[in-house]
Amino acid sequence: MAQGHTTASAILHNFRELIKEPKGLDDAANYLFQGLLDDVVAGIFIEIHHLRKTGNLTALDGVGEENAESAYRICEMPNLDIFGISTAKKPMDCTCPNCDRLVAATRFAPHLEKCMGMGRISSRIASRRLATKEGSSASSTSTSTYLQSGNTGGTDDEDDVDWSSDKRKKKSTQNSRNNGSKKNNGKTF
């Protein structure tokens, strides 16, 4: 950049020297034109050299006229868009890595969750199994004596304590239920 600035100032200095003489006005115009032309040609030469060395020169060439027509050809075949790409929906299937089944892509995540036993329902079932195993291992002797006694009829609810309270709350009336409540119970105002 500094080199271009010194070149321009040198051109102006030499141009002013030539203008001082009216006879050299024609020479001054030629000198100015020649200096500007040399700068432009040198700049273009350096830019093209740089593009060729970096491999970007082919991008400036553009597309030939023969190739231009084929590049913008519109496809008018059925089931294809204007670029020639199929518009039919392709079924996206995935293979489950756990069971090697083909599963639709939209159902892959839920399938994998169930297949690997990591879903909500699976974790609940696993929790029940663990609780059952712990309960059965702790009371294995009582269960075995219960089964050995031949007591297969009835339920084991008979010995359980009822969790419901004997005292039942009275149903509240409609007025007491709405006191202080912001619900309108379907009524419109």
From Swiss-Prot:
GO terms for cellular component: cytoplasm; DUBm complex; nuclear pore; nucleoplasm; SAGA complex. The keyword Transmembrane does not apply. The modification Phosphoserine is found at S165. Residues 136-145, 175-189 have a biased composition (Low complexity). Keywords: Activator, Chromatin regulator, Cytoplasm, Metal-binding, mRNA transport, Nucleus, Phosphoprotein, Protein transport, Transcription, Transcription regulation, Translocation, Transport, Zinc, Zinc-finger. InterPro entries: SAGA_su_Sgf11 (IPR013246), SGF11 (IPR051078). A zinc finger (SGF11-type) spans 94-115. It comes from the Eukaryota. Component of the transcription regulatory histone acetylation (HAT) complex SAGA, a multiprotein complex that activates transcription by remodeling chromatin and mediating histone acetylation and deubiquitination. Within the SAGA complex, participates in a subcomplex that specifically deubiquitinates histone H2B. The SAGA complex is recruited to specific gene promoters by activators, where it is required for transcription. Required for nuclear receptor-mediated transactivation. Binds independently on SAGA to promoters in an RNA-dependent manner. This is SAGA-associated factor 11 homolog. It comes from Drosophila virilis. The lineage of its organism: Eukaryota, Metazoa, Ecdysozoa, Arthropoda, Hexapoda.
